[in-house]
Amino acid sequence: MATERHYSPLDRLLLQADTAMRTLLPFSGQPTRPSPAIVQPDADLDEQQARHIAGLMRINHTGEVCAQALYQGQALTAKLPEVRKAMEHAAEEEVDHLAWCEQRIRQLNSHPSVLNPLFYGMSFGIGALAGLVSDKVSLGFVAATEHQVCKHLDEHLEQLPHEDEKSRAILEQMRIDEEQHAESALEAGGYRFPAPVRFGMSLLAKVMTKSTYRI
């Protein structure tokens, strides 16, 4: 029977650095699942449509960068091994989303946000602090964040042109995954944040969406 490997603090820091590089460098993320867009037909989009869709996908890509950083920060400071493993597993699934969004952005002749390193650092710090408070708060933060992501995905799905089936397929699968992450975090004992905290998180999310739509 295989034994679980135990990492030293230095090992974990090196793994965090490697994850950050793979998250932020172009074409670095290797998805474990093929993009849902592969089987969808190409759409005849005009320049304005393509630019708008690229902006939406750039927002979603940065959202996944933030989620990846959040999970990594929480995994670094989580107190219970099972919580740490849950964070690391969720982060692995976010790699798929990162790769899918970047692929679609490139197909639309655009680029990920130049602000990604800033948002990664901020999200990592928030995740690490949440993990230091307690695993219950950490898991609750995951649930609240993923619910916020689901709201953004719903809004973006409404804005997509009907003919853009590639982007739609990606966002619909992401929506399914993110909802599962939120429910799993709550089932694991995550704290349900009160409305004022969720409102504050939504304001921060708006800063991210407004700034990354174009850059």
Swiss-Prot record:
It is a peripheral membrane protein. Its EC number is 1.14.99.60. SUPFAM superfamilies: Ferritin-like. One of its GO terms (cellular component) is plasma membrane. Fe cation 2 binds at E94, E146, E178, H181. Keywords: Cell membrane, Iron, Membrane, Metal-binding, Monooxygenase, Oxidoreductase, Ubiquinone biosynthesis. The keyword GTP-binding does not apply. Catalyzes the hydroxylation of 2-nonaprenyl-3-methyl-6-methoxy-1,4-benzoquinol during ubiquinone biosynthesis. This is 3-demethoxyubiquinol 3-hydroxylase. It comes from Pseudomonas putida (strain ATCC 47054 / DSM 6125 / CFBP 8728 / NCIMB 11950 / KT2440).
